[in-house]
Regions:
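Membrane-interface helix-loop junctions and terminal tails of multi-pass membrane proteins
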Residues: 1-287, 291-304
Length: 304
């Protein structure tokens, strides 16, 4: 468990360091100095978050699952892929990792005025047109989408492309959400920068904690009751300790084969050979004495 917690701490720290660091670098230097358009800066920031998550998943995916996001860990706990205690431990180290990552950014850029903190209204790229309601709706929907993809992809047996799919999904939601809120979908990514930036970023932080959690819960429930393939209650059996993922025709055929296989041993239990031996013994014991008695009676009559 210690290895998992350390992996989550380091992974979240790197996510904030490279993701938010790219946002700060682009907005502070590239966008202002070279007058690059907003869509291009959005693309750079989105790809930065997606690529760093892909790299993190490739490195620590086999160790901790590479959640690096409290919303993902909460969804995993709801789906019973981890215990509540494990989920709490994951969330704590993820938040700490995000704080350390933001602290490193402040040291690198020589200040804490801009660390890629999330926000709406005056803090967003669209300005005052982004209201509180808009920010909540955007964050809930984006987190729902991202966490749902994580749940579906991580449940598959072939995990070779998981990191790429999840990373591209994170880049996609960033492309959509950056103008509205800067895109959080991850409370640990928002907490660290907001703590050091303070001001409106800190006062608006609750939105980027509550909305992603709500989106994660909705995604977990949708996955559980709509997408997830469950074992049928009619036929309770296991095939190589895996859940059935076949069509209804195969499911009905498999029990029939198993029932036939179970009937054959029942027929073999009836032993016919011992029964024949018992009959032979009874016949020999009855006939032998009868012959001897007849022979004796005949000899006695002749003597007389």
């Amino acid at each position: 468990m210690v290895r998992k917690l350390i992996s989550e701490f380091v992974g979240t720290m790197l996510l904030v360091l490279f993701g938010c660091g790219t946002a700060v670098a682009v907005n502070t230097y590239v966008f202002s100095i070279y007058n690059i358009s907003l869509p291009f800066t959005m693309l750079i920031i989105a790809l930065a978050f997606g690529l760093v998550l892909t790299a993190i998943a490739s490195v620590i995916g086999n160790v901790s699952g590479a959640h690096v996001n409290p919303a993902v860990s909460i969804a995993m706990a709801i789906d019973k892929r981890m215990s509540i205690i494990e989920c709490v431990e994951y969330v704590i180290v993820q938040i700490l990792g995000g704080i350390v990552g933001a602290e490193i950014l402040g040291i690198i850029f020589g200040g804490y005025t801009s660390l890629g903190a999330n926000g709406y209204g005056a803090l967003s790229a669209l300005g005052e047109t982004t209201t509180l309601a808009t920010a909540i709706i955007v964050e809930v929907l984006l987190t729902f989408t991202f966490v749902l993809v994580v749940l579906v992809v991580s449940a598959k047996q072939d995990k070779g492309t998981n990191g790429i799919v999840i990373g591209l999904t994170l880049a996609l939601v960033h492309m959509f959400g950056i103008p509205f809120t800067g895109t959080s979908v991850n409370p640990a990514r928002s907490i660290g920068p907001a703590i050091f930036t303070r001001g409106d970023a800190l006062s608006q932080l609750w939105v980027f904690i509550v909305a992603p959690i709500v989106g994660a819960i909705l995604a977990a429930l949708f996955y559980k009751f709509v997408i997830k393939e469950r074992e049928t209650t009619k036929f309770e059996f296991k095939i190589t300790n895996r859940k059935l993922k076949t069509s209804d025709k195969v499911i009905t055929a498999v029990p029939a084969v198993k029932e036939a296989a179970e009937v054959k041993p029942a027929k073999k239990v009836v032993k016919k050979a011992p029964a024949k031996k018992e009959v032979v013994k009874k016949e020999t014991t009855k006939k032998a004495p009868a012959k001897k008695v007849v022979a004796k009676t005949k000899t006695t009559k002749k003597d007389k």
